[in-house]
Amino acid sequence: MLTAIRKNGLILAVFACVSTGLVALTYALTAEQIQQQEQKQLLQVLNQVIPHKYHDNPLAQACTLVNDDKLGTAKPMHAYLAQRDGQPTAIAIETIAPDGYNGEIKLIVGIANNGTVLGVRVLAHQETPGLGDKIDLRISNWVLGFNGQQVTADNQDDWKVRKDGGQFDQFTGATITPRAVVLAVKKAVEYVNQHQQQLHNQPNPCEGQ
């Protein structure tokens, strides 16, 4: 009886070791593939918010981490630093709209050195399908309305949805979501405008973050 129990225990132990080994092997074989896919997706987004003509450096690697209340979170946000012929040209910065209808909305905003918005994309959100999800370019082209915009002392009131007297469309039945995104983009542009030189001079510690 005792021998049988020991035998069964040994079999289970061997099975557990083999299973663990297979899981580890599978992870090792797929980790690089997953990393390559994530890098590919990151590059696609970066090239949407900072067009190719603005950079000839490896944008995904030219990254620094920043903390500021204007970015909507206490967590470090990634900023990607574009250069052309060795000269700074633009910055793509992550930011959070903390007051979306269903929670935080994570964005990335591309901003040229003259303060012009080059592109905005939604990285993550939980907004209501058919209503607030129109911030996603896969659903509507609303987010393209930021292209070419600037934030200046004279146009502060324009950076609101139309319902609040601004220039950006709200969605039928969903004003909270676009209002949150407009404010988050505005603050991100203001942050970059104020810290542009500092950002371009920061080291690039993002690898593995």
UniProtKB/Swiss-Prot annotation:
SMART domains listed in its UniProt record: FMN_bind
Give the record's GO biological process terms.
electron transport chain
Give a yes or no for keyword Aminoacyl-tRNA synthetase in this entry: no
Subcellular localization is given as: Cell inner membrane
Tell me what topology the record assigns in the membrane.
Answer: Single-pass membrane protein
The superkingdom of the source organism is Bacteria
What are the protein's UniProt keywords? Answer: Cell inner membrane, Cell membrane, Electron transport, Flavoprotein, FMN, Membrane, Phosphoprotein, Translocase, Transmembrane, Transmembrane helix, Transport
Obligatory cofactor(s): FMN
UniProt keyword Electron transport present? yes
Record topology, Cytoplasmic segments = 1-8
Indicate the transmembrane segments per the record: 9-29
Q: What is its EC number?
A: 7.-.-.-
Q: What would you give as a GO molecular function for this chain, any one?
A: electron transfer activity
For the Periplasmic compartment, the record's topological domain ranges are: 30-209
Using the UniProt record, name the top-level EC class of this enzyme in a single word.
translocase
Q: Which InterPro entries match?
A: FMN-bd, Ion_transpt_RnfG/RsxG
Broad class of where this protein is predominantly found: membrane
Provide the Gene Ontology terms for cellular component. Answer: plasma membrane
User: FMN phosphoryl threonine: which positions carry it?
Assistant: 175
* Family classification: Belongs to the RnfG family.
Q: Which HAMAP family match?
A: RsxG_RnfG
Q: How does it assemble?
A: The complex is composed of six subunits: RnfA, RnfB, RnfC, RnfD, RnfE and RnfG.
Function, please? Part of a membrane-bound complex that couples electron transfer with translocation of ions across the membrane.
Annotated protein name in UniProt: Ion-translocating oxidoreductase complex subunit G
Per the UniProt entry, what species is this protein from, by scientific name? Vibrio cholerae serotype O1 (strain ATCC 39541 / Classical Ogawa 395 / O395)
